[in-house]
Amino acid sequence: MKIYNTMTRKKEEFVPVKPNEVQMYVCGPTVYNFFHIGNARTFIVFDTVRKYFEYRGYKVNFIQNFTDIDDKMIAKANNEGVSVKELGDRYIKEYYEDADGLNLERATCNPRATEYIGKIIDFVKGLQDEGYAYEIDGDVYFNTNAFKEYGKLSGQNLEDRMAGATIAVDDRKKSPADFALWKSEKPGEPSWESPWGKGRPGWHIECSCMARDLLGDTIDIHAGAIDLIFPHHENEIAQSEARTGKPFSKYWMHAAYLNINNEKMSKSLNNFLTARDILKEYDAEVIRLFLLSAHYRTPLNFTEESIEAAKTSLERLYNTINNLGSLLNNTAESNDDSEYLKALDSYREKFIEKMDDDFNTADGISVIFDLAKDINININGKSSKAAVEKAISLMRELGKPLGILQKVEKHNLEDEIQNLIEQRQNARKNKDWALADKIRDDLKERGIVLEDTPEGIRWKFIDK
């Protein structure tokens, strides 16, 4: 299995710290609002990575944090007249509702930053004792000049960043690139006692502390959205490696942006879609199929047409499964399909080959469609029950790491199609050619064609 490592900018063979285990940390949401469809892409991508590791037999320790103390949270809580804790509790609850709606597997642990204040203080104190941090008027900063490898993840030269707009300007700091580990108390903000006076932690130190506490000094995979490479992940590396003297993470993974109608998503452009918005319109499996239809390192464009195309594609796959289900009671028990059963197994091998190559979900999905096409051509009423059952099982097996094809259809597809055929026959008798043509075209759009036979009208699936 190969993973593209942002740190080395190349694909590397995956070798975990502990055999057959994966220690994985994904940066989670700041809980002051509903998460948007761009966040959903990141969460679904790394949920799929986790599911695929499990499919391949690994035990995955999957940590995703909640940032529940932050400038944005404080501002919103003050604006609403509630405590930061009340705001965090509310949106953590909303997060779980939307995450469950997207079929995200629950994390092994979802630590909250405010649960780690004591350990964060100890972490910062350790950095200060080793000469990597300094205190000014109750604020504690990380000394980037003391960490000689600063910039190795993002490729940013420290000197080039001195006057950068992404760095907070503070004349008290030794270097403009130095960042806050601990912030002194300000009016209207939550604060905790510390050796430097009352205050609260900086953003970057929270993840370093929680990851180390729950996963150890060196973890296998640290992941997040591409916009976290700098400064967040760069600063995490500096803090963690300065504190432990060990590599923080063996592999760094980052998911690319999601645009809306070829524009960056933003509230000012009125194109800001929350996961909850999209879940009102589309099933979770449709959303997952769309968001996984491109490789996770490739930017993806969301349009109404593209999500509708994903919906149609998913229906085609379910049509194949449902057609197989309708054949189960009409199979030839004595037929020898042993060669075809072996041929079906080749699709599992192809799927693994694609997914082992840096979790290439786009190519993995293509394998599933190739499998469906093969099934539609080769499995029919003359096939053995073993072949039909194997085909159903394999479709669902390959869909599982992607979080698709896991639903059991509640309706009987055969009865539904037969009902539509009868409606079409009645329309033709009544010379309602428009309705008859519409029913025929609707069925064709679903991959179903009608055939006139001496025994009456029959239907079958085709690959569109």
From Swiss-Prot:
Family per record: Belongs to the class-I aminoacyl-tRNA synthetase family.
Note on cofactor: Binds 1 zinc ion per subunit.
Motif ('HIGH' region) on chain: 29-39
Enzyme class: ligase
Protein's UniProt name: Cysteine--tRNA ligase
Catalyzed reactions per annotation: tRNA(Cys) + L-cysteine + ATP = L-cysteinyl-tRNA(Cys) + AMP + diphosphate
Record keywords, A-Z: Aminoacyl-tRNA synthetase, ATP-binding, Cytoplasm, Ligase, Metal-binding, Nucleotide-binding, Protein biosynthesis, Zinc
Protein's GO biological process: cysteinyl-tRNA aminoacylation
NCBIfam families assigned: cysS (TIGR00435)
Taxonomy, superkingdom: Bacteria
Requisite cofactors: Zn(2+)
EC number: 6.1.1.16
Encoding gene, per UniProt annotation: cysS
Gene3D superfamilies on file: Cysteine-tRNA ligase, C-terminal anti-codon recognition domain, HUPs
